[in-house]
């Protein structure tokens, strides 16, 4: 039976299209990555970038590229990958196309926890991703408790997410009021962006991106099983509740890692899986990796536009994504209500 299913998959003409989409996506990701590194207020070229890679130092271009742009672009790529995977997983687990770490309050929980460390315990900034993960899990548990009624109800999930986000946003506002002398470094972080990103941020988020990419191969099979329904999934040997817990934990970890380095970025996990679902379909074997690829592309492009469009003024990426994502979210919400 396994051999037959593999044979069918090979013969399926859609698999060629899906593989082509991912291959072209990888090429586009590499191209966008390098182009973004040389674009900015200071003029640099591909030859300057090449000199950085071969170790030519002691030039102004080297300092700009190595210490500012390269770590910033890499951080944006990793954050985009993590948020897109997290959003795709949450949409699959909850069977809700509106699920996104930023919309349903997971990012807000991670943000409050991260902000507590950055303001009150700045000497422990290396612990920010772990603490943010704890905050994300707390938010997720509260969300499940509020939205559960013989299963997750989509409308209740959105309403509960708004309430959870408001609660944790209130906590962040309280921190800003009581520690107003220490918030200067966190204001831009709350708006969401990569200004000031360094190699420290790259090393902070990279391990979690690796975990996410490894988790993609495991998660895709589990998510495909869950789409068949609980009874069918159980008959196939899937431990449904344990699977849901594992997947939600993985999504919370990835969202928290992105929040810890980029702040409150919303809609990445909503937009990318939707766009890729239109292209590659609902098979998570293709949907998850393609979402990861194009999530990285989206945030690299968004960051590049945000820092260059109104130069020398830099628009926070979170603001830029909100202008794109909010209308898209309202469109999906309206379409979902019309179907009901």
Short names for language-model regions:
Residues 1-340:
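Alpha-helical transmembrane segments in inner-membrane proteins
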């Amino acid at each position: 039976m396994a051999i037959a299913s593999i044979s069918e998959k090979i013969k399926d003409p859609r698999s060629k299209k899906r593989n082509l989409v991912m291959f072209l996506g990888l090429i586009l990701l590499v191209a966008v990555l390098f182009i973004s590194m040389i674009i900015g207020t200071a003029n640099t070229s591909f030859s300057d970038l090449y000199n950085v890679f071969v170790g030519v130092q002691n030039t102004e271009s080297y300092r700009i590229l190595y210490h500012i742009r390269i770590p910033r672009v890499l951080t944006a790529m990793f954050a985009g990958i993590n948020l897109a995977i997290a959003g795709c997983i949450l949409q699959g687990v909850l069977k809700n196309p509106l699920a996104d770490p930023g919309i349903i309050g997971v990012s807000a929980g991670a943000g409050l926890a991260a902000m507590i460390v950055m303001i009150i315990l700045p000497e422990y900034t290396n612990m920010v991703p772990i603490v943010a993960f704890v905050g994300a899990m707390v938010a997720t548990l509260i969300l499940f408790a509020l939205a559960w009624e013989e299963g997750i109800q989509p409308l209740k999930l959105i309403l509960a997410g708004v309430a959870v986000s408001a609660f944790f946003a209130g906590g962040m506002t309280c921190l800003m009021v009581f520690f107003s002398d220490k918030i200067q470094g966190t204001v831009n972080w709350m708006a969401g962006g990569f200004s000031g990103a360094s190699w420290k941020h790259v090393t902070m988020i990279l391990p979690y991106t690796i975990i996410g990419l490894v988790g993609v191969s495991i998660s895709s099979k589990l998510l495909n099983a869950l789409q068949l329904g609980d009874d069918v999934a159980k008959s196939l040997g899937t431990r449904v509740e344990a699977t849901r817990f594992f997947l939600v934990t993985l999504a919370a970890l990835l969202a928290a890692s992105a929040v810890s380095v980029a702040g409150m970025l919303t809609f990445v996990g909503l937009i990318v899986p939707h766009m890729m679902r239109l292209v590659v379909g609902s098979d998570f074997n293709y949907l998850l990796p393609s979402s990861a690829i194009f999530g990285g592309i989206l945030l690299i492009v968004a960051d590049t536009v945000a820092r260059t469009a109104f130069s020398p003024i830099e628009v926070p990426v979170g603001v830029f994504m909100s202008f794109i994502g909010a209308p898209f979210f309202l469109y999906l919400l309206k379409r979902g209500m019309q179907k009901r």
